[in-house]
């Protein structure tokens, strides 16, 4: 309900990739060609990780279930700290394993979440500068990690925020989670178009 009452809000999906949508006064912003909101494909690291879109350094290569998996493997190559993650083959590895390890205090997993939160928080600070939302809602698999992703994201977002926006934008978990989110979102868009 609180999502519907806000004038401007941004929604970020942290799943296998990174999806997003920008809503203003209850209306989805599509842009002139329907592709507005491709937040996952902003460049956050020049000549960074290769993305499926063909570019390098896209946000979703750092801030998604796939991105945090890549981060954890990169960290295992550079960190000497013991980690339960070292015993798992890359093909068998997923974000839920990183989350479970972080909950148990695994230093590699904790650093993977900190770094992921840093990348997301810095990017969200830029989005706030452009969209000036009342709130940003995170949902999707990676957001289920709770404070592991929300705390560093909030900290880095505030740390990099333009001063006029500091401490004014809420970062919240979406009330809609799981497989129903996409179905409900698509249904709402169709309903909205039919009732114009």
Walk through the language-model features, giving the residues of each.
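Structural signature of FAD isoalloxazine-binding scaffolds in flavoprotein oxidoreductases
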Residues: 35-38
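Conserved hydrophobic/aromatic beta-strand scaffold that supports enzyme active sites
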Residues: 11, 41-43
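Short beta-strand segments
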Residues: 10-17, 21-23
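Adenylate-forming
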Residues: 1, 19-22, 42
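ATP-binding/phosphotransfer module of carbohydrate and carboxylate kinases, centering on a glycine-rich
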Residues: 5, 28, 43-50, 55-196
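Conserved small/polar residues in nucleotide/adenosyl-binding loops
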Residues: 3-10
